[in-house]
Design a protein with these regions (language model features):
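Glycine-centered flexibility motif
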Residues: 6-8, 12, 39, 142
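Auxiliary Fe-S-binding modules of radical SAM enzymes
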Residues: 29-154
Length: 154
């Protein structure tokens, strides 16, 4: 009917193991989604997992690279969570194999209403007014932002 599928997981979420990560990777291979969103787990203080530690940026980058190898054409975002845990997390994600950025185009005045986790990245490079800064940061690592429709190439 004309839609595409996606799946994903949080890296370093409570009770996750190497085995569950292997199962997640196997599922991605079998399910064959058009997009897979993974990012490090970031606790939110008002949830049952609020006292757990955040996931690892390095492990997330490793898993992004594995997914890129397993599914060469998949749409693979460099998540805001990576940028929240590391000042150059988005760029590191792209260098590890991500090929999608999803900037938050909400006005800065409205961002507090959408707090998925504590200390969520919310900078000028995330707003529509500062898209040029995002383009420049991606250009600085040898890539460019494309704003055309982003269907997967099969």
């Amino acid at each position: 009917i004309g839609f595409q599928t996606g799946c994903g997981f949080m890296v370093g979420s409570p009770f996750q193991t190497s085995f569950t990560l292997a199962e997640d990777l196997a599922f991605i291979g079998e399910f064959d989604p058009e997009m897979c969103g993974i990012g490090p787990f970031i606790p939110q203080k008002d949830t049952p997992f609020g006292k757990f530690s955040a996931g690892s940026v390095q492990q997330t980058l490793f898993l992004l690279s594995l997914i890129r190898l397993i599914k060469p054409n998949i749409l693979l975002p460099a998540t805001t969570a990576l940028g929240t845990l590391s000042p150059n997390g988005r760029e590191l994600g792209i260098k590890a194999g991500a090929n999608v950025v999803m900037p938050n185009l909400s006005p800065l005045s409205e961002r507090r209403k959408y707090a998925l986790y504590d200390n969520k990245l919310s900078t000028g490079t995330e707003s529509a007014q500062s898209l040029a800064l995002l383009k420049e940061s991606v250009k600085n690592i040898g890539y460019k932002i494309v704003t055309a429709r982003g269907d997967i190439k099969k």
